């Protein structure tokens, strides 16, 4: 790759597999949320999970009329991921499951609940960002999009038995080369995957290259200069919670835009939609994607902010990085006219009171068309409003 050109920039994003310890924790927290929402749409949930060798601790603040078998649900999530035998260092059948769940503070609750639902206040103060770019068909940055797809492919060939020596824990990292803000290729591919003890390094490298990397990454972006780092330490037998402890909410950049956009700092998993850390970040993505889909900008970043107990956002900011077809002020006016960004308004707009959250907890919350915040149904209205 012609990296001596002054116009060429490198940008890198990473992803992790569903078997990464932090992602195990995220999936357990969101599985608890989903089970509660099935029974109690008005529940208030803030569920945190910690996993380490031989144990999972589920805690947080939950106010609900629902009953959930936390122990069996936690074991089922761990089993579904693939930790089903003690040989892996973490076993759904034998690990301890500890329950440390309490109730939400009434001080918070009085600022959120209202007789008029549209007056529902934000569950906390905070800032949230949403982003979209037209460099991929899902209007997401390419590095994080394809890093996620590598991890999805790793899980697919692991669970199908095609590469039977694969284990659940894995990480990917992609460095893309850009010239004048256009992708010209992939400069580096990093993929580390947990594996069975008996597999040889040569077999592992060949298997990962042929079954994971080549079927996933577009060949037009790969060339003789692309560098590959497959299990560069040479050994990755001990992984999952035996290798590292895992905690809900510790992969916020993997969950969003891979560092290509700013982040407000709030994690998503385990939080019901009254928490604007989660729901307003989804709404900000919906707004940004709608603007790009409407052709009003090639790139768009939205910032929202809220005050606890207050319904209306305290600010809305638009940045189009010089790619806007209209002014940022015009876009802000269009947002106010077309999107209800009050907590209850955005929950209704995106139909967020439904059990869809466990699926978000691995492979990214954005760029996956099954989620309602990925719709572009308002793009035409934005175009016509000009």
UniProtKB/Swiss-Prot annotation:
Q: GO biological process: any one?
A: one-carbon metabolic process
Indicate yes or no for the key word ATP-binding.
yes
Identification of the protein by name: S-adenosylmethionine synthase
Question: Which NCBIfam families does the entry link to?
Answer: metK (TIGR01034)
Q: What does this protein do?
A: Catalyzes the formation of S-adenosylmethionine (AdoMet) from methionine and ATP. The overall synthetic reaction is composed of two sequential steps, AdoMet formation and the subsequent tripolyphosphate hydrolysis which occurs prior to release of AdoMet from the enzyme.
Question: Which residues bind L-methionine per the record?
Answer: 61, 104, 244, 275
| Amino-acid positions noted as binding ATP in the UniProt annotation, renumbered to this chain | 20, 169-171, 235-236, 244, 250-251, 267, 271
């Amino acid at each position: 790759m012609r990296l001596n050109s002054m116009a060429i920039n490198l940008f890198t994003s990473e992803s992790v597999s569903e078997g990464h310890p932090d992602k195990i924790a995220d999936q357990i927290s969101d599985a608890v949320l989903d089970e509660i929402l099935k029974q109690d749409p008005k529940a208030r949930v803030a569920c945190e999970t910690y996993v380490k060798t031989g144990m999972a601790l589920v805690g947080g603040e939950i106010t609900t009329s629902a009953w959930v078998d936390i122990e069996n649900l936690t074991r089922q999530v761990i089993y579904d991921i693939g930790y089903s035998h003690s040989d892996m260092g973490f076993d759904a059948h034998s690990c301890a499951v500890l329950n440390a769940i309490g109730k939400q503070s009434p001080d918070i609750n009085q600022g959120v609940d209202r007789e008029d639902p549209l007056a529902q206040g934000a569950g906390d103060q905070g800032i949230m960002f949403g982003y979209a770019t037209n460099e991929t068909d899902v209007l997401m940055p390419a590095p994080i999009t394809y890093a996620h797809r590598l991890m999805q492919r790793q899980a697919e060939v692991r669970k199908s038995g095609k590469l039977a020596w694969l284990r659940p824990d894995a990480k990917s990292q992609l460095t893309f080369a850009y010239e004048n803000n256009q992708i010209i290729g992939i400069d580096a591919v990093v993929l580390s995957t947990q594996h069975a003890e008996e597999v040889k390094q040569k077999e592992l490298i060949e298997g990962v290259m042929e079954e994971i990397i080549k079927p996933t990454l577009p060949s037009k972006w790969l060339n003789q200069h692309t560098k590959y780092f497959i299990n560069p330490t040479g050994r990755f037998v001990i992984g999952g919670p035996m290798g590292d402890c895992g905690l809900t909410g510790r992969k916020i950049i993997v969950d969003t835009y891979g560092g290509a956009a700013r982040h407000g700092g709030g994690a998503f998993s385990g939080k019901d939609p009254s928490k604007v850390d989660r729901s307003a970040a989804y709404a900000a993505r919906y707004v940004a994607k709608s603007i790009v889909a409407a052709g009003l900008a090639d790139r768009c970043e939205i910032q929202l902010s809220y005050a606890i107990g207050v319904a209306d956002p305290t600010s809305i900011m638009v940045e189009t990085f010089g790619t806007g077809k209209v002014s940022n002020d015009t876009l802000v006016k269009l947002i106010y006219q077309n999107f209800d960004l009050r907590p209850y308004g955005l929950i209704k707009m995106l139909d967020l009171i439904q059990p869809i959250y466990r699926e978000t907890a691995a492979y990214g919350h954005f760029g996956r068309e099954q989620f309602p915040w990925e719709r572009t149904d308002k793009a035409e209205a934005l175009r016509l409003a000009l």
